Amino acid sequence: MDERAQRKRHTLLGYGACALAGTLWGTGFYFGRIALDEMSVEAMVLYRFLFACIGMLPVLIRHRARLTPSETRTLLLAAALGVPIQFLLQFHGLVLTTVSHASLMVGAMPVLLAAAAAVFAGERLDWVGWLALCGSTVGAAMVVLGGTRVTTGNETPSLAGDLLVIASLITALGWILLSKKLMQTHSPRVVTAYTIYSGMAMLAILLFGMQLLAPLFHFSAPEIPFTQVSARAWAALAISGLLCTATTTLLWNWGINQVPASRAGVFLNIEPALGSILGVELLGEKLGPYAWLGGALILAAAITLTMRDQETQPAVILE
């Protein structure tokens, strides 16, 4: 296999990995909502990453990284942004707003990623790429708003919840770009494993530290239930950790190591689209013609970016 054919193969596999990651991420809100019926946001995120650490343990044992002091600081910053900060902001926002609102804002992520990659990582996207990204985002908006939804209880959107979700997207941008920088000198699986374990350690220190300090400073710390958690919630947490976190992060990091992050970002729109489709069962939504048209826009954007004969400049392939 010549160099050009091998590069094309890596590019297609990279897009496939990003697409699969976006698909699995799309189930995250569904399984997260199941767990949130029985525990706090903090407990749900903690257990989710505990299962993710279990899934990444073989990688951590088999692959040791030698990081420079500068790389260590970058890794810790990426872990802080990508684990405790992003997930606590996102799911606290989900509690305060509706799934449709949260999914709609996540649909803006590809354009934000493309802009950030152009500014901070020196990546370039031509007008067709920008058009595809914008079309994909419009498609995601049509999917999440293209169904009728009966609001019950306290399920109403709020500015505070929307702003928390937006803040989580900004932190996710930092995690993606910092991870891509680390993967210039380290393999994606090493970066993924060390990021998840470092982020889990930060999350555990934060939550258990709050438990210890709560009696001293007289504030209410989030409870971490265990024995009273149902088998259904444990199954949702295990799937969230093993598939929606460990597997997706590994796939995404490997994928953006093969293709520019600005172009791979279109596959992030699978998340809100699939999340909205799962909402049919979870929230009683009905998908109308606009939703189906939105799905077609997302698919067309993905095909446009992946099938165009354009040379990409991926990061150094280490595997």
Label the predicted regions:
Residues 22, 33, 45-49, 71, ...:
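Residue-level recognition of transmembrane alpha-helices
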Residues 23-29, 57-106, 116, 142, ...:
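Specific transmembrane alpha-helical segments of multi-pass solute transporters/efflux pumps
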Residues 43-54, 82, 87, 91-133, ...:
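Specific alpha-helical transmembrane segments that line the substrate/conduction pathway
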Residues 24-39, 51, 87-97, 105, ...:
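Juxtamembrane C-cap of transmembrane helices in multi-pass membrane transport proteins
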Residues 1-20, 65, 108-171, 290, ...:
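Juxtamembrane helix-loop boundary signature in multi-pass membrane transporters
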Residues 27, 31-34, 38, 52-68, ...:
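Membrane-interface helix-cap regions at the ends of transmembrane helices
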Residues 31, 89, 112-116, 178, ...:
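Hydrophobic side-chain positions within alpha-helical transmembrane segments
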Residues 13-17, 43-58, 77, 130-141, ...:
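Hydrophobic alpha-helical transmembrane segments of multi-pass integral membrane proteins
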